[in-house]
Curated annotation (Swiss-Prot):
Keyword Transit peptide: no
One GO cellular component term: early endosome membrane
Domain-related comment: The SMAD binding domain (SBD) interacts with the MH2 domains of SMAD2 or SMAD3. The FYVE-type zinc finger is necessary and sufficient for its localization into early endosomes and mediates the association with PI3P.
Zinc finger intervals, FYVE-type: 699-758
Lineage: Eukaryota, Metazoa, Chordata, Craniata, Vertebrata
Name this protein carries in UniProt: Zinc finger FYVE domain-containing protein 9
Protein's job: Early endosomal protein that functions to recruit SMAD2/SMAD3 to intracellular membranes and to the TGF-beta receptor. Plays a significant role in TGF-mediated signaling by regulating the subcellular location of SMAD2 and SMAD3 and modulating the transcriptional activity of the SMAD3/SMAD4 complex. Possibly associated with TGF-beta receptor internalization.
Gene (name only): ZFYVE9
Impact upon substituting Q793A: No effect on complex formation with SMAD2
Annotated binding of Zn(2+) 2, by residue: C721, C724, C750, C753
Length: 1425
């Protein structure tokens, strides 16, 4: 395999070199210089230049090299009467008849006409559907920063349609209006994005009669209908249009009485690249005789190239005729919204508010090239002009759009001559006027569409145009998850080169990236496997299958009806790792699409009117202006504006300006609120980032960091982000994330991708609760809030009577009906909105107070428009109960820190019902102080986040009035609980909430694996508790101190003692000295547990101390090694250094690191001693030795804090050894021979005795004993098993950080600890010591996966701490699981059996001798960010 990748790397480099040489010969230097510049620094307001359009002429390239154009469409026609339209506008339902999807596939461009004539029936073609004067036209909306090929498709409509229902037009969850869904089309070089979309109007009638009917004489009573486009089934293929043809329906009459374009047919236009790199575009025309049209029709003029007209503050739509029209346009431009054009209504229909919000660009997809000689020369910009613009554009890439426009105006006559030439050439080929299905295409072909000018003759008003946000459309054949779909992506017969696969993909991604701010949204209804479309045809299984394939992350194979395409599809294999991903020559890697905020950080913001935020195209910038005129009229309810996922958008933009919780700044990157704004179960806002291997930017093309732009040098190295493939410096690419395509292994990612991935993970966890089953404890979840009639219509059972929903009185609980609380209170919530007693919180009450109901509550956009996606209606905005605004749709309480800046965190108040609490938001300092001063038996409980509580009480501790802060929830992240006793200040009237913030910081650190233990520390980075001199906390365990009247958590726990900044070096280097010094200061043994603010520091400058020789006070590179459990006992003429036998390895490490002439080590606090040495620094900076002891107890054993053996004593000195007390430790001077003997004894784990005194003395002065004693069992004090309450004291345990963690239904189950209850160390039970780790990991993973479906129910039942005891013995293999001292209920055991039994039996096979009994501890948490 390595040889294969090496060969592939060599071949790829060779191909790249040859390609660059060919480029040098055939492409101008300008293109070569800017090739990677488009990747490294793409212009944010212009399109990437397309070198494939360098020469556009009439010659045709070989058919084999021409890419195929695949148009996917699913047309739905809905004939509506005027009454039905009004009914729909008022929030009711109207019908929608989905048509069977058709698609054309043509493998040979030459034989296209013959294939169309021979192989396709009337129903298989793209039909031109004409409607009456009341029809609304279509407007294709193009993103202003994408190379786009627009293909507007009109479909025929026959009576063989499946019956379905159009849901409420104003229902924001409705996905039935699939107007203008974009299907991506690819050409070979993939430098132009091609997508087709249209909103088609047709009537449900026989198409044969429709062919014969004069399109201008249709009855006016016909209701308007909308054909909604969505991807077709892979098994029903139609409408393949050859890319070498540009068909244009050029017969447009002029009828002053008709203001709407009566017919529009778009066939295909594509710019294709031949084998020689020169594109050939051939334009054909489907001619419709003038006899079919009555009168003359005004031809609207599409003008391309107005500079900056795509910006919100720019020209937008230019009007050249009526002053009234000009004022209308100016109004729309001031409001920052594109103008909705509406035809004249001769019968006086009151549809005058037809305004929609859409993207920045307006391109009418109903454009008919007038073939008559009577049309004005300067008012028509035909497709030939478009091609001419393409020619000039490709000849000079530096030419701006404004220059292009001017150049086209100058060459207008030449353009029309060329157009006539094209029309004459293409006219004989396709003159079937009876086919009824012609298509007209507009080739964007790399042009930077910066403006759209629409004008018409004096006799006509503007045509009706419906705008659709282009940002909601997917380009390049990607679904809403960014995955390439084989049914949409084009696979050329001539496979692309590797250079195409590697480099041009990156160019496409960068040129598109500006327009992707809104495409990463929800996939829609989860019932259709997360597809982005709500299938309107309930009986068409093939369509469902295709929708599933289209939105799936793994490209699926097309159906049997397209065997040729199936044969040409390459197999997708995603490589990863290496400097440049190796890939087959026919594979195009999928580019991870970042979020908009990812792009905001990635590229500098634009200046001027070219605003960076793509969501600003929805008109949020100036939504407040002219909002009354911009709101869509109710009469347009049947022509709703929907995005890719079928969500209705029109009322959102209309009302967002009036909703304070949604009023975001126009340049805010947080404007990407599309999915959550409608209460729909949104998916994570990005997809392929980290899921597929990115295309790496070559080192040679990245001289600077792509974030901070620091230049790379010999010392400043390049680092590739494993998620996006870009090149960054070490500081910008220093984080790590688990990437899916690397089997969830941690890899280096840039800070931008890290933020995106973390947000997306939180998004995914947050939204996972929306697909839960109803809670059996609450019947309200089984009752729908959708009116019965709408349910019937939505299910298609219109002919059957509406269902009757009967609920017994009193079954549904409504907290709002309870007695009013005397003050503002809230229910305790979980992230999914379930109360501890299983009741679902009432939405109205919760939203009023800031909590969320079950699932994801949506924001109600209008009091009269119910949001049916929420289990209960929401009537007010959702704001975080701490006062800050959270992201719309996110569960309240999911933030890491719920402490407001200007107040206190929420308080839990017991309601008297077991398991039920009320939540008081922003309690006042006065009321809190009053309750605390009253001194009730129970403490106040503050909510710091959904998993962390803090209990507060004022206590009297050792005759001191103190605040007592206690945490609850630290155990779940592997951290001991924290207790802080803070002495109250005189007349203190405010609760010191800095303690809360520090608790949250400790929780964050513990999540990252950084926990504090006994004699550990945490420091402050800023002023704390009103003083910058407060340096941090020193954490100690309680020994001899009094714990009376304190609020204590479940063991284990630590006490935090406030220390000063001058004391922080000792907390880092030698914390036991600081602890004992505090005890000496306050005359408490061994130290006080309370903290005193603004006290004098106990240590100053380090000065002259022996510790300067043993530890590094300057850089903290080394400290005095401390062996856990080692103590020093000092008695009369006897000093004992006791080393626990189970700390042999630690002792060896300390000895091996020490100098050969010096052996030193720190000691632990000796609980068996009744006194201890203390080092005190006086005012002169000198260190003195004192001793503290237990009050009223005689001193027998005195402890010391360290020992030092020095081998510098010479035998000529006359001493065997010398011992002395230095500061708070013992120093022993021995000879070099004795030092060697001591080290050898320690290695052999033997006791060693040193005799001190003169060599000729009759009696020795003192003995120094180095002893190996029993194992250190001073662990797990007070810990009991959650399975059966068994004490876990003295049992060895291991904390687990970054271990197994699984998320489901808004909950997280974490494996935090493992105890080894029985393990015979002398007998190696497992074949390898690492087997312990592997076995426990496998068991933990199986346990978590088995309980994931039950996490919600377990937490509701109070079983948040779970234990799993596994026994592996020769005669017994099994497990026990329990919580709260009881075994788990039987309902969970079946899943555990199937998951654990295979793993445990597999581990039992590794046994050799002796039993293994281990207990794993798990916690169930809320998923917080």
């Amino acid at each position: 395999m390595e040889n294969y990748f090496q060969a592939e790397a060599y071949n790829l480099d060779k191909v790249l070199d040859e390609f660059e040489q060919n480029e040098d010969e055939t492409v101008s230097s300008t293109l070569l210089d800017t090739k990677w510049n488009k990747i490294l620094d793409p212009p944010s307001h212009r399109l990437s230049f397309n070198p494939t359009l360098a020469s556009v002429n009439e010659s045709a390239v070989s058919n084999e090299s021409q890419p195929q154009l695949k148009v996917f469409s699913l047309a739905h026609s809905a004939p509506l009467t005027t009454e039905e339209e009004d009914h729909c506008a008022n929030g009711q339902d109207c019908n929608l008849n989905p048509e069977i999807a058709t698609m054309w596939i043509d493998e040979n461009a030459v034989a296209e006409d013959q294939l169309i004539k021979r192989n396709y029936s009337w129903d298989d073609q793209c039909s031109a559907v004409e409607v009456g004067e009341k029809k609304c036209g279509n407007l294709a909306c193009l993103p202003d920063e994408k190379n786009v090929l627009v293909v507007a498709v009109m479909h025929n409509c026959d009576k063989r349609t499946l019956q379905n229902d159009l849901q409420d037009c104003n229902n924001y969850n409705s996905q039935s209006l699939m107007d203008a869904f974009s299907c991506s089309l690819d050409n070979e070089n993939r430098q132009t994005d091609q997508f087709s979309f249209s909103i088609n109007e047709s009537t449900e009638k026989d198409m044969n009669s429709e062919k014969q009917m004069d399109p201008l004489n249709r009855p006016k009573t016909e209701g308007r209908s909308v054909n909604h486009l969505c991807p077709t089934s892979s098994d029903s293929l139609a409408s393949v249009c050859s890319p070498s043809q540009l068909k244009d329906d050029g017969s447009i009459g002029r009828d002053p009485s008709m203001s709407a374009i009566t017919s529009l047919t778009v066939d295909s236009v594509i710019s294709s690249q031949g084998t020689d790199g020169c594109p050939a575009v051939k334009k054909q025309e489907n001619y419709i005789p003038d006899e079919d049209l009555t009168g003359k029709i005004s031809s609207p003029r599409t003008d391309l190239g107005s500079p900056n007209s795509f910006s919100h503050m720019s020209e937008g739509i230019l009007m050249k005729k009526e002053p009234a029209e000009e004022s209308t346009t100016e109004e729309s431009l001031r409001s920052g919204l594109p103008l909705l054009l509406k035809p004249d209504m001769p019968n006086g229909s009151g549809r005058n508010n037809d305004c929609e919000r859409c993207s920045d660009c307006l391109v009418p997809n109903e454009v008919r090239a007038d073939e008559n000689e009577g049309y004005e020369h300067e008012e028509t910009l035909g497709t030939t002009e478009f091609l001419n613009m393409t020619e000039h554009f490709s000849e000079s890439q530096d030419m701006t759009n404004w220059k292009l426009t001017k150049l086209n105006e100058m060459n207008d006559s030449q353009v029309n001559e060329e157009k006539e030439k094209f029309l004459q050439i293409s006219q004989p080929e396709d003159t079937n006027g009876d086919s009824g299905g012609q298509c007209v295409g507009l080739a964007d072909a790399g042009l930077d569409l910066k403006g759209t000018c629409i004008s018409e003759s004096e006799e006509c008003d503007f045509s009706t145009v419906i705008d659709t946000p282009a940002a909601n459309y997917l380009s390049n054949g990607c679904d809403s998850y960014g995955m390439q779909d084989p049914g949409v992506s084009f696979v050329p017969k001539t496979l692309p080169s590797k250079e195409d696969s590697v480099t041009e993909e990156k160019e496409i991604e960068e040129s598109k990236s500006e327009c992707y701010s809104n495409i990463y949204e929800q996939r829609g209804n989860e019932a259709t496997e997360g597809s982005g479309l709500l299938l309107n045809s309930t009986g068409d299984l093939m369509k469902k299958n295709y929708l599933h394939n289209f939105c799936s992350q793994v490209p699926s194979v097309l159906g049997q009806s397209s065997p040729k395409v199936v044969a040409s599809l390459p197999s997708i294999s995603v490589p990863f790792g290496g400097a440049r991903p190796k890939q087959p020559s026919n594979l195009k890697l999928q580019i991870p699409k970042p979020l908009s905020d990812h792009l905001q950080n990635d590229f500098p913001a634009n200046s001027g009117n070219n605003t960076k935020n793509k969501n600003d195209i929805l008109g949020k910038a100036k939504l407040g202006e002219n909002s009354a005129t911009n709101v869509c009229s109710p009469s347009l309810g049947n022509i709703s504006n929907v995005d890719t996922n079928g969500e209705h958008l029109e009322s959102y933009e209309a009302e967002i300006s009036t909703r304070p919780c949604l009023a975001l700044a126009p340049d805010s990157p947080d404007n990407d609120l599309r999915a959550g704004q409608f209460g729909i179960s949104a998916r994570k806002p990005f997809t392929t980032l980290g899921e597929v291997a990115p295309v790496w930017v070559p080192d040679s093309q990245a001289p600077n960091c792509m974030k901070c732009e620091a230049r790379f040098t010999f010392t400043k190295r390049r680092h590739h982000c494993r998620a996006c493939g870009k090149v960054f410096c070490a500081s910008c690419c220093s984080l790590k994330c688990k990437l899916l395509y690397m089997d969830r292994k941690e890899a280096r990612v840039c800070v931008i991708c890290h933020s995106v991935l973390m947000n997306a993970q939180a998004w995914e966890n947050m939204m996972s609760a929306s697909s839960q089953s109803p809670n059996p404890n609450n019947p309200a979840e089984y009752c729908s809030t959708i009116p019965p009639l709408q349910q019937a219509q939505a299910s298609g059972a219109l002919s059957s009577p509406p269902p009757t929903v009967m609920v017994p009185v009193g079954v549904l609980k409504h907290p709002g009906a309870e007695v009013a609380q005397p003050r503002e209170q809230r229910r305790v919530w979980f992230a999914d909105g379930i109360l501890p007693n299983g009741e679902v919180a009432d939405a109205a009450k919760l939203t009023m107070n800031g909590t969320s109901s079950a699932g994801t509550l949506a924001v109600s956009h209008d009091p009269v428009k119910p949001v049916t996606t929420s289990p209960l209606p929401a009537e007010t905005d959702i704001c975080l109960f701490s006062g800050s605004i959270t992201q719309v749709g996110s569960p309240v309480g999911s933030a890491m820190n719920l402490i407001p800046e200007d107040g206190l965190p929420p308080i839990l108040i017991s309601t008297g019902v077991k398991g039920d609490y009320a939540v008081e938001e922003k309690p006042s300092q006065i009321s809190v102080m009053q309750q605390l001063e009253d001194g009730g038996p129970d403490p106040l409980v503050f909510v710091l986040n959904a998993n962390l509580l803090s209990m507060v009480k004022i206590v009297n501790y050792v005759n001191r009035k103190c605040w007592c802060f206690t945490t609850k929830g630290m155990h779940a992240v592997g951290q001991s609980e924290i207790v802080i006793l803070l002495q109250c200040l005189p007349d203190e009237k405010c609760l010191p909430k800095d303690i809360f913030n520090h608790f949250v910081q400790l929780y964050r650190d513990a999540l990252a694996g950084n926990v504090v233990s006994n004699l550990g520390h945490s420091f402050f980075s800023q002023s704390f508790l009103g003083s910058k001199e407060h340096g941090g906390f020193l954490y100690v365990t309680s020994t001899y101190q009094s714990l009376q009247d304190l609020v204590l958590p479940t063991p284990p726990y630590l006490f935090g003692i406030l220390i000063q900044k001058w004391e922080t070096p000792w907390a880092k280097v030698f914390p036991i000295r600081l602890m004992l010094r505090l005890g000496a200061e306050y005359r408490l043994y061994p130290c006080p547990l309370f903290s005193v603010r603004f006290r004098k520091p106990l240590f100053g400058e380090t000065g002259h101390t022996i510790m300067n020789l043993l530890a590094d006070f300057r850089n903290y590179q080394y400290t005095l090694p401390v062996v856990q459990g080692l103590v020093v006992d000092m008695e009369v003429r006897k000093t004992s250094i006791k080393i626990p036998s189970n700390r042999y390895n630690e002792m060896m490490k300390a000895m091996n690191k020490s100098n050969e002439h010096v052996l030193a080590g720190g000691a632990c606090f000796n609980e068996k001693a009744d006194s201890h040495l203390v080092c005190v620094q006086n005012d002169d900076g000198n260190y003195q030795t004192q001793a503290i002891s237990i009050h009223n107890q005689p001193r027998k054993v005195t402890g010391a804090s360290f020992f030092v053996f020095s081998g510098a004593l010479k035998s000529s000195s006359g001493y065997l050894a010398k011992s002395s007390i230095v500061e708070d430790g013992v120093m022993v001077q021995i000879t070099a021979e004795n030092m060697d003997s001591l080290r050898q004894a320690l290695r052999e784990m033997k006791d060693f005795t040193i005799t001190c005194g003169k060599a000729d003395a009759e009696e020795p002065q003192e003995h120094i004993h180095i002893q190996w004693v029993d194992d250190d069992k001073n662990v797990s004090k007070g810990v009991v098993s959650p399975i059966d309450g068994k004490s876990m004291e003295t049992i060895t345990n291991v904390k687990i950080f970054h271990g197994s963690e699984y998320k489901a239904n808004g909950k997280v189950i974490r494996w935090t600890e493992v105890f080894f209850l029985e393990n015979d160390d002398q007998h190696n039970c497992l074949s390898d010591p690492a087997d312990h780790s592997r076995l426990t990991e496998h068991v933990a993973k199986a346990f978590c996966l088995a309980l994931c479906p039950h996490l919600k129910l377990l937490k509701e039942d109070g079983m948040t701490k779970l234990g799993l005891r596994v026994t592996l013995d020769s005669d017994q293999v099994g497990y026990q699981a329990g919580s709260n001292g009881q075994p788990l209920p039987s309902q969970y055991m079946n899943d555990l059996d199937s998951a654990l039994v295979p793993v445990i039996h597999g581990g039992a096979c590794q046994l050799s001798e002796g039993p293994v009994v281990m207990e794993l501890i798990f916690y169930i948490l809320e998923n917080i960010v």
